Amino acid sequence: MEVIHGRPYCCRELEGADILSNTFYSNGLHTPYETTIRPTASEDRYQELRQALPQCRLRWGADREYGGMLPVSLPEEHRPKCEPPRLMSKGHQHYGFGGEIWPKKLPIEQYYYLTQNKKSDLYGNDSLLPKPPNSTVGEICSSYPIEHPYHTHISRGAMFPAFTSPKDLYTGVKARTQQPFPPTLPTKTYDSTILKTRGNPYRYELLDLPTDSKKKALTWPGQSVYYDFPKCVEKNKPVFYPKPPKTFAPNSSVTPWDTMTSAKDANIQRNLERSHWLTSYTHDFTGLGPMSPLELDDYREKELAELTGQIGFDPQPQEKFHPSLKPPRPLDGRIARLIQNQRPLEATVQIPPSCPDCTPRVLCAFHTFIPSSAEMMAMNDHLLSGLTHKNQNIEDKIKEEQRLLSTYALPSSYESKDMGSLFDLHSLPKITDTKKSDDLYWRQLDVKPLPIARSKSNHYIDYEPHKSTYRDPYAMCLNPVRLSKSNILQNKTDMADLTFDNYLRKPEFLGTDIESSDETRPLLNWISRAGVPKHHTNFRDFKNSFSRSMAHKRLHNSIQEEQKDLRDKLQCGMRHQFYGHNSHYFYN
């Protein structure tokens, strides 16, 4: 078929010059005039110019058929002197159109670019190979990938995946360069040589067992794909049915087996492989809940172990952090502070001193050497609770006060008077305003002096109305009378009798020499709440007095309004549907 040198520009379909290969344009020997120019304008501009190009309308609806207005194709010996006009030509009859083929007895140009079929890049006809005189055919020997014919029914990967990396320190490329090989690196089997003569019943095998320094590392062939060689003149006949990759390699490697680039990445990949060896029971039940994420990057620790000379340092991946049970929120108040070993909260209220002459920082001359009633009460409380062996500081303080009393020189107005005479003469109340002058302070008032309290041994104070301190740890004092009547102010008492035994006597003998009548109230009657016993609290009775059922009953009785039926579907107010269910099912 003759090649017609022309451009089918009359056909409305695209010629598809953009999708042809470069061979169509580079071959100037066969088709010198069909090297079309690729459009350099944009696609939108190209469509706009194509629509604006005036085209003649084909007759009989021929624009919808395969074909177009083409020049008449005639042989060279029958070509007329003048070029005949273009005629309607039909293309390849891919689908029959039911009409008569017109024109007749003329060669028809095949338009392969109108369909999905690919046109030959070199020739205008259907010949795919050049003729032997025009080309030389040579045999090419190159490897090509080959697989088993039943490879589609054979799994490519192994059932248990392998994480072996060429960058691994123990099984990778670096481990293969070290001899002797580590125990983690597999080696090839020994070579066996079989010596047997045909027809000889005796079989002789020669086994070569190399030493560790001469062993070779085991390699898995066909990690990526198998290549086979075609049958050539200088090559042997290839194996037609190769073995599938699974029979050789456990699994195909993702990365190529090249030189190691990062030992740290290989160590992380090995730890990742070992982390998959942990069972679900070990991962979920550690005693402290599920296992935390593992620390996969321990390359620094392994380097330090290698520098220090440790052999076989390959620990299991450890957890990044160990979970710890968080203690529950402690109770509020006194119990919480006791659990946390903290000081219990106390009100910091400064109690005014019992003596008007004393200040919180400076004591008067009388209480500087003689202990106050509060100190006396503290000493007796410690004695009654059986903890006298822990009060060495109090004993040392009292002994020091006794020593000071023995060496203290009284003023001139008290030189020839003892404690009894001092109480008789100076028992009148004084003006306690210390901001006044000393003359006003020492001036006596014109009032009747108080009766003198005498020591009588036949008087007895009843202790029945008061609880014992041994059974009630919340009591403030042993005897309310003891706070208001101190034994240091007893009449006819010498200073030499003021010993440690007088301070630390038993409670039943401490107040027997003191009268409890209203007429014999002592001078130290300004102590606040001296004769009033403290209210005894019982936390256990308060706890047992609470009843949950009674509290619910009082709560329901306090609600006087009529209870609403939650089953009523009201359109106003709060909603009654929760999670698709009526609130009646959640009521109590």
UniProtKB/Swiss-Prot annotation:
Sites of the Glycyl lysine isopeptide (Lys-Gly) (interchain with G-Cter in SUMO2) crosslink: K543
Phosphoserine carried by residues: S224, S406, S421, S427, S437, S457, S484, S516, S545
Keyword Glycoprotein assigned: no
Any one of the GO CC terms: cytoplasm
Modified residues (Phosphothreonine): T219, T512
Phosphotyrosine modification, residue list: Y441
Superkingdom field: Eukaryota
Predominant place of localization: cytoplasm
Keywords: Cell projection, Cilium, Cytoplasm, Cytoskeleton, Flagellum, Isopeptide bond, Phosphoprotein, Ubl conjugation
Keyword Hydrolase: no
Signal sequence interval, chain numbering: none
Cell location: Cytoplasm, Cytoskeleton, Microtubule organizing center, Centrosome; Cytoplasm, Cytoskeleton, Flagellum axoneme
Function: Microtubule inner protein (MIP) part of the dynein-decorated doublet microtubules (DMTs) in flagellum axoneme. May serve to reinforce and thus stabilize the microtubule structure in the sperm flagella.
PANTHER family hit by this protein: C5ORF31 (PTHR31393), CHROMOSOME 7 OPEN READING FRAME 31 (PTHR31393:SF2)
The protein's name: Sperm-associated microtubule inner protein 4
Lineage of origin: Eukaryota, Metazoa, Chordata, Craniata, Vertebrata
Gene: Spmip4
